[in-house]
Amino acid sequence: NLSFGVMMQPQRTKFVQDYLGVHTDTVRNVVNFSPTLDFRYKFSKMSRLRINYRGTTSQPSMTDLLNIRDDSDPLNITEGNPGLKPSFTQSVRADYGNFTQSHNLGYAIFGNFSTTSNSISNKVTYNEETGGRVTRPENINGNWNAFVGGFFNCSIDSAGVWNVNTSLDLSYNNYMSYLDVD
């Protein structure tokens, strides 16, 4: 069984703000793109494989996109970034499971990998002379995570009263960030 699809989601955002003497009245029209793929295969009634892919687009917040510098606190200045790009996350998940009824035995293995291009991270630039910092949202690459796991269950007696259940999960997250010193 194989299915796939693409979702195109139009989004209209209106933003009105008066801040630090700056009047902002803007509209953003975007289309978020989200492809999917799902593959399922049954080896038998009790044994199956599934692989799933999903892509997701996320837009930067309207406030992050505004070209406004807030220096009301000279030690903690914030800036917007009108050049921010949308982020796109891709995820792949796979799992395999099997159950043998005559032995009351079951096991499964599964895994997931996800990566995001153009993630949005706050870039903090520290000024050693003033002790102040400037924070500005920026796109960054290199964020990803992985997860694998599995379980095993079985009866150790013929009546199925005594069972052994065990599982193992491992995960790793890789997050990138910015830090600059002037």
Outline where the language-model segments fall:
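Exposed, low-structure sequence patches enriched in small/polar residues
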Residues: 1-182
